[in-house]
């Protein structure tokens, strides 16, 4: 478990610790309940009438303090990709679905799970790929991580060599 505190409280605590040992007692209340949430999902249809589609997914929620990189930067990339794909919609052989999931940072992944539960039949029949971008554009990044299934390992390695030009990358699944 972790508890967040304000910057002012953190600075005060740091100053106290600098003067000597400190005992702190903190308490928190956490509500774990179901409630309605809005989840933005956009679709760009294929130009061929194909029902197949790729999914771009990312999360809207964030921890306090890290929202610019986790995941506002990823969502900005999705918005730009959706804009470009929409411009070229008549040429697309497959459609594109862009999902901005809620409930990600709680550890439950409830937004994306709800989407899968609700649209399972369509996903099973027509979804061909899923791409999630989370925490891009971090200044000073020296390690890139790609996760997928083992069938795509060689493909990812080739793309990473070409795009990253020798920067180390980690692949996992």
Residue ranges and their predicted role:
Residues 71-72, 113:
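"Short basic amphipathic alpha-helical interaction patches in structured regions
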Residues 1-69, 79-95, 117:
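Soluble metallo-hydrolase cores and metallopeptidase-like ectodomains found primarily
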